[in-house]
Amino acid sequence: METSTTTTLLQQERIPENSEPISTHIHTHSLPPTPPGTAKPSRIGSFHDLQELSSVESPRLDHIKPYPLPPKFSPKSVLKEDLKTPDNFVERDPRLIRLTGVHPFNVEAPLSDLYDEGFLTSENLHYVRNHGHVPRCEDDDILDWEFEISGLVENPIKMNVRDLINDYQQLTYPVTFVCAGNRRKEQNIVRKTKGFSWGPAGLSTALWTGVAIGDLLSAAKPKRGARYVCFEGADKLPNGYYGTSIKLNWCMDPNRGVMVAHKMNGNPLPPDHGKPVRIVIPGQIGGRSIKWLKKITITQEPSDNWYHIYDNRVLPTMISPEESANLPEVWKDEKYAIYDLSTNSAICYPAHEEKVPFTDAPASYKVRGYAYSGGGRRITRVEVTLDKGKSWRLANIRYPEDDYRNAPEGDTLYGGRVDMWWRETSFCWCFWDLDIPLDELKSADDIMMRAMDESMNVQPRDMYWSVLGMMNNPWFRIVIHKEDHALRFEHPTHATLKIKGWMERVKEAGGDLTNGYWGEKAPGEVQEVVVKEPEKQICMTNPQINRKITIEELKAHSGEEEPWFVVKGEVYDGTPYLSGHPGGAASIFGAAGQDATEEFMAIHSENAKAMLPTYHIGTLDEESRAILSGDATKTNDDADREVFLQAKTWSKAILDKKTSISPDTKIFSFKLNHEAQKIGLPTGQHLMMRLRDPATREAIIRSYTPYSDGSDCGRLDILIKIYYDTPQRKGGVMTQALDALPIGHWVDFKGPTGKFVYHGNGLCTINEKERRVRRFIMVCGGSGITPIRQVLRAVIDNPKDTTPCLVFNGNRSVNDILCMEELEELEAANPSRCRVVNALSNPPPEWNGLKGFVNQALVPEYMDLPKASGEGDELLLVCGPPPMVKAVEASFLGMGFKSDDFVFF
């Protein structure tokens, strides 16, 4: 049977359910933990349909392995940001930081999350570099996906993935991928390059399974004179299909480890990583490892593909972005092409904005991070300085990659031979650490580090700026701030747009980041007044255009027909550039009818800004600018009005009281303008709150569902869980700002907002469309109880409303269950209309309720009561942490519910 054969091939050594292989190698260094294995495959992963079709049980990996195995991966889903893009079928992890807007998908993980996963990176957090949309390959077509080997060969080959798996020896080994733009944001702060900003997490490590490319090329028999191997993928872009090349002798050298891969961490390749087949080139920049492979061509010369010539190059530093546009021969010069990675490293802990208290802290702090090199060269030393390079100390280095060299003879993993014992080459990153006494950190201004590889190639002190901003690898520096009772650490940059590091701070203060002293004054240097020169302004308008455009005209072009967008108050027509945009038309559609200033200015290069005059059609009038920006500075001064909330203007209320209901949750009470003033919030909707960040004074805006009933008068109560800063991660900006707000301070409110309104007696509207409900199934966790409670009370408080409500409240511990007594009272008084099921993932021994997560395994036995009655649909109302929401959605979809049966708050 074809289906059985297909799934058998794809499922060879797939990570099985209920299997947790463990590592026997005990590490004494402070290496971030690599979880020993994956308990079970994602049920909403790219291959879940094939899993269910398979009748062949996967081989188990419950024997002991002497090396790290992949971390457990979390369920993913198609994110709302991608729904209007060509990638609307690709499941992704919301933790990944988008670096180029919504589309195309270019992301890195938060640095601490990446480091904490350990040596191997899960599919969830692996960085992604996509030049355009993801080519779509259906699961049923994977084994039939064809690629060819042609050119200067005696035996041209056309083969498919089935042939690749059946006819050639399979290998498995770890490889660290690094984007050539890793740490580019540091260069962009010094001067904007033509590349978008990467933080220091543009790298990841995975186990790859496939065939040595030398085996395939040997079968094709390259002819005399052949010197290069060109690769081309299926991703069609404005300048053709993405392609590149490397040298033939590298491909034929087993030490180089070049592979044609079809598995990642034991599972078939996910869409973002080349599904169904890709090239893996250890030790070289990620841009050479073509995804969605279609062609391998043997040639006498390097690739003439547009992307091989105009990408992944380090041009001489004196060439500016403007000059580079008119130097085609320089771009074609192969000596500027990047292949092997350079020595590079970063400090992961202390994390950005991490604080270490002076009291109740250990006597020393373990500084930790990563390092890597290219071309198979091993990192041989990592050095740390606390005095700007006057003296250095050696760090400890741990090489988890070496554990794979200890694999027993004949060992296989995920269907491939663990082919490492004989290799002298190093394909992966390593981890380093160094204990530094806290007293020494107190007396230092910064921590800097550098790495060296076995060729004695050491990271330079100073940056080598280039037009593409690639291969940035100067010493990694974090600044130490002495505060009242703690040390605060500041990284050079942060991957997100709004979080700044010391480089931005120094530059904004007028410092020269190229002065050889990190923009600061050298000891003994005479203080002089620095006049900060204004940055060179790129003209982004056409001086011959003087048309005034209204908000009505702009909104008429907010769709895919003639999309207009706004940058700095100027209006541009993106229609002529739909086919030429590097990210595809979806990038322009996503900005249609909107003010794209912040995103455009932060992401785009000087060249892109210089192109804007071509598309300039007019200026937004002043009134329209105010409307488009949300009229941010205006508030409603009509204090005597009947209803407090206003949809288009902000209204002020004064903080009157804070009431703690758990260690990290409070009810914030606000006094309205007069005792008879109604809140004005329909059931099921929420409001927006605005206040200023106490440090930056920038506006913080978040949405909340009040604890108060929407018809209450004179007061507004909001239940909020406060996410405090920890040594591992930064807490919630808004919640901590609210917690620090003194009684008597004003806060701005606007609303109502939301797509769902409950009108009573089983009638609701979703996006203004009426819907009859015969039973509510409500699922929440933590402070997600607030919108659920609001709808539940609206039902129960109306004696004529007979709509049954089944509530699943999932939390970690008893202390996390908010409004517990109130919900129990509602259930006891209304058994025919209300049932509350509490579930704890970390219950105490005396807990008698549901144990575990709210999912398909635990929910069905509670679904019968209270029974659904009357006409209409069962509607799921869901609010909680993102991982919980995704798991709940997957579980109920698996139980037969449809996507339009969900309302997510």
Curated annotation (Swiss-Prot):
Annotated ranges, domain Cytochrome b5 heme-binding: 546-621
Keyword annotations of the record: Disulfide bond, FAD, Flavoprotein, Heme, Iron, Metal-binding, Molybdenum, NADP, Nitrate assimilation, Oxidoreductase
Residue positions binding FAD: R702, S703, Y704, T705, L719, I720, K721, I722, Y723, V733, M734, T735, S783, T786
One matching Pfam family: FAD_binding_6
Cofactor: FAD; heme; Mo-molybdopterin
CDD domains associated with the record: cyt_b5_reduct_like
Extent of the signal sequence: none
Residues involved in NADP(+) binding: L875, L876, L877, V878, C879, G880, P881, P882, P883, M884
Domain FAD-binding FR-type residue range list: 648-759
InterPro entries for this protein: Cbr1-like_FAD-bd_dom, Cyt_B5-like_heme/steroid-bd, Cyt_B5-like_heme/steroid_sf, Cyt_B5_heme-BS, FAD-bd_FR_type, Flavoprot_Pyr_Nucl_cyt_Rdtase, FNR_nucleotide-bd, Ig_E-set
Record-listed Mo-molybdopterin binding positions: C179
Catalytic activity: nitrite + NADP(+) + H2O = nitrate + NADPH + H(+)
EC number: 1.7.1.3
Gene Ontology biological process terms from the UniProt entry: nitrate assimilation; nitric oxide biosynthetic process; sulfur compound metabolic process
Region (Disordered): 1-42
UniProt-listed Gene3D superfamilies: 2.60.40.650, Cytochrome b5-like heme/steroid binding domain, Nucleotide-binding domain of ferredoxin-NADP reductase (FNR) module, Oxidoreductase, molybdopterin-binding domain, Translation factors
Binding-site residues, heme: H581, H604
Cofactor note (record): Binds 1 FAD.
One annotated GO molecular function: molybdenum ion binding
Family indicated by similarity: Belongs to the nitrate reductase family.
Subunit structure: Homodimer.
The protein's role, per its UniProt record: Nitrate reductase is a key enzyme involved in the first step of nitrate assimilation in plants, fungi and bacteria.
Protein name: Nitrate reductase [NADPH]
Gene field: NIA
